């Protein structure tokens, strides 16, 4: 087989409502997020399950579950850092699933479920993976769950410049277990009159209630990064909407 590349976009959630069920396939989050470029570019090979991120070996907790699919080594190139809130854990898990499908003919549905479960069981994410799988720019996760079980709706909006600044590496676990009923209120407010600015305004309110404050206008802080609308200064990472989800070529 010729060498393959797997392209997976980033995902930054602005509003989320965790949903835990007895069937892990339907566990996840209802929420709003931005699926963005620049994507990660992943070079998979058959071999001992290992993850190399920008040429550095990383200990990736999800690998405990992902390695049950197949023996895959991933070499990942990324323009954004790991552990700051860009949804990279979900993106890496998704890439591992797609690599298992491509290299070993593992059933795609099974691979996606294991990748989803690896995120849930390590407390690394609830909605990143399904958002990155389908893509769409601004997305609404209507139903929680793995790809094929959850449901994602792509919201059509007029795009403006978006950029981010990574500030600090932080754990996801506390973030996703913080359940706020205001999330559902803000999601409904957004759906009533959707726009990119409205997404930023409501995400700012929601994340501020969780203790994440951004000093910049038209922006919000999610975990260890700030995402900003319109004002993209030097030193910030520029983003475009990832209209397509993850793909292999």
What are these regions (language model features)?
Residues 1-82, 235-249:
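ATP-binding N-lobe of GHMP and related small-molecule kinases
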Residues 5-8, 13-16, 131, 138-141, ...:
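Short hydrophobic-aromatic micro-motifs
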Residues 6-7, 24-25, 33-36, 122-124, ...:
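Solvent-exposed alpha-helices and their adjacent loops that cap or buttress functional pockets
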Residues 77-85, 223-229:
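Short glycine-rich or small-residue beta-strand-to-loop segments that form or flank ligand, phosphate
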Residues 86-109:
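DPxDG-like acidic metal-binding loop motif
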Residues 102, 120, 146-249:
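C-terminal nucleotide
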Residues 109-153:
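Alpha/beta catalytic cores of group-transfer enzymes, especially the acyltransferase/condensing modules
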């Amino acid at each position: 087989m010729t060498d393959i590349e797997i392209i997976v976009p980033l995902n930054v959630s602005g509003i989320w409502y965790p949903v835990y069920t007895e069937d892990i396939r339907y566990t996840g989050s209802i929420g709003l997020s931005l699926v963005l470029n620049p994507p990660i570019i992943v070079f998979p090979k058959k071999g001992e399950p290992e993850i190399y991120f920008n040429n550095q070996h990383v200990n990736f907790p999800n690998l405990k579950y992902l390695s049950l699919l197949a023996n895959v080594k991933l070499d990942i190139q990324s323009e954004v850092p790991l552990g700051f809130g860009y949804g990279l854990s979900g993106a890496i898990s998704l890439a591992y699933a797609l690599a298992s499908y491509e290299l070993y003919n593992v059933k795609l549905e099974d691979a996606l479920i294991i990748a989803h479960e690896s995120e849930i069981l390590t407390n690394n994410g609830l909605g990143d993976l399904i958002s990155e799988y389908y893509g769409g720019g601004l997305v609404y996760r209507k139903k929680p769950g793995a790809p094929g079980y959850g449901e994602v709706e792509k919201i059509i909006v007029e795009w403006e410049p978006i950029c981010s600044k990574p500030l600090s590496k932080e754990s996801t676990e506390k973030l996703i277990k913080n359940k706020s009923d205001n999330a559902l209120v803000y999601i409904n407010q957004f759906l009533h009159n959707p726009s990119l600015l409205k997404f930023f305004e409501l995400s700012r309110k929601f994340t501020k209630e969780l203790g994440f404050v951004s000093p910049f206008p038209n922006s919000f802080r999610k975990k260890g990064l700030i995402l900003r609308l319109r004002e993209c200064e030097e030193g910030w990472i520029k983003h475009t909407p990832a209209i397509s989800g993850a793909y292999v070529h």
